[in-house]
Amino acid sequence: MKHPIYVTADEAVKAVKTGDHIHLSSVASVPHVLIQALCRRADNGEVRDLHFHHFHTEGPAPYSEPRYDGIFFDQGFFLGPNVRANVNAGFADYLPVHLGESQKLYRSGALRCDVAMVQVSLPDENGMFSLGTSVDCSLAAVESAGTVIAVVNENVPYAYGDLVSPGLIDYLVKDNTPLVTKAFAEPDETEKLIGKNCAELVPDGACLQMGIGALPNALAAALTDHKNLGLHTEMFADGILNLIKKGVINGMHKKIDTGKVVASFLLGSEEVYKFIDHNPDVLMKDIKYTNDPWIISQNPEMMAINSATEVDLTGQISADSIGTRIFSGTGGQVDFVRGATMSEGGKSVTAFASRTKKGQTKIVPVLNPGAGVVTPRADAHWIVTEYGAVDLYGKSLQERAKLLISIAHPDDRNDLDRAAFERFGPHYHNFSI
């Protein structure tokens, strides 16, 4: 058992050695004070060849920047706008992994974790710390790392669920920098239609998984007349909070963690962070738990609602890339697709606008060259756009093509139909769905 001591950020990062692999707590809880201290060591020529691993991070990301080429090398599990350009320029990299398995990388030793840098709440009466808004795979990193540096921040909410024992920590650093908050754009008319179409698939008493952003917020707004919904998700934000406050989400029909909101990380307003602070109705859990398909499936009528960058006419779903350009990450999409479809009465839903902001169709004859298939065609079920919803489960390739074309943008349907005919031959036009 370790006996943590309080030190300054500059003193703490002296534990980092050249060649180390470093885990950063992510999303709203990035330990920027430690990153800044590490940059000072790098600027003085004290360390090099450091590898960073993390989920989506908010704020400056010097660990991915060209000026630290050869000194820092970023290998994130999920990309945000702060690292995306550097990854696609080759100054940083992307490590594909289902989020539910990200913790296994550390626990199995498949990925080194020499140093874990995390943010934690003030300790409770038993000396235990909460990882607050970012439990994800940070708990696994803390358990696996040779050295653990924890920033104790009074702005990190104390969330019930999986906690960190002080016996796992080497160094504690006090810093009360506010957590990053994020306001998402209001849904546009297209997103509102998609949200409405998704909401029509959600029965009262269902259990939800959804992400963050304008489209999930549109769905949340369309669910205000539903009753007795549950929440078991990897993350949530303000749209979900509104449903909880209105009593729409109460978890009364959940078969596991009944009455509890279960998540692994958050990003949103300060109100969301305050909501989880010492709230016994919220459990912030290890990603191993939240994203375990078997755990997910224990809740009946589980609704996994995710998005895509494009879908081809056979139902292959790309969500992490646009052609060869990495956009985000695999995320937990497949974890929840599998869990929802294993659930009694569950549904997997992939929702997106029929066209990009530039007017290009997202339902395509074939995926752009180099695009990653996140959800394979055999796992594709409900597909939703502003023009409707179709279920691909149990449908042949030609049947899928007809269904998908029916919810494509009207101006793209003729071209898609022609492409389907060229692919499948004359029989394609000889049957109806």
Segments and roles (model prediction):
Residues 1-433:
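Conserved alpha/beta enzyme-core scaffold
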